[in-house]
Amino acid sequence: MTYLFVAAGGALGSTLRYWLSGLIAGAIGQSFPWGTLVINISGSIVIGAFATLTGPDGRVFIPGDWRQFFMVGVCGGYTTFSSFSLQTLTLAQEGQGLWAAANVVLSVVFCLIGVWLGHVGAVLINEGV
């Protein structure tokens, strides 16, 4: 049953990623993979908060299947490491090494900050602050 939950969550997350990437590309342009960057940062914030809120010390109880639905399915389908990797390679192959390096640095730094912010926010919620 967990596999069905994960598959359904993945379908939702992937659809949301596709929609939001298109929205961002239409608004900002496609010279840099801003959509992927925004998605990976926001996905990191969300999974950091959700994992902490629903973890052993969390304030919110979520049954295991539903936790997997959201964390593995929705967040896994929403975030885009393979897309990030391909877009970085494409930038490098097109002679845009500085943009490729910026994509790596910005993605890693801000996704780590995002997951930390999500975690800290959830810890505060768990503590009733």
Curated annotation (Swiss-Prot):
Instruction: Tell me one GO biological process term.
Output: cellular detoxification of fluoride
Q: Indicate how activity is controlled.
A: Na(+) is not transported, but it plays an essential structural role and its presence is essential for fluoride channel function.
- Residues given in the record as Na(+) binding sites: 76, 79
Any one GO CC term of the record = plasma membrane
Functional note: Fluoride-specific ion channel. Important for reducing fluoride concentration in the cell, thus reducing its toxicity.
Give the HAMAP family listed for this entry.
Answer: FluC (MF_00454)
What is the recorded name of this protein? Fluoride-specific ion channel FluC
Organismal lineage: Bacteria, Pseudomonadati, Pseudomonadota, Alphaproteobacteria, Rhodospirillales
The protein's gene is named: fluC
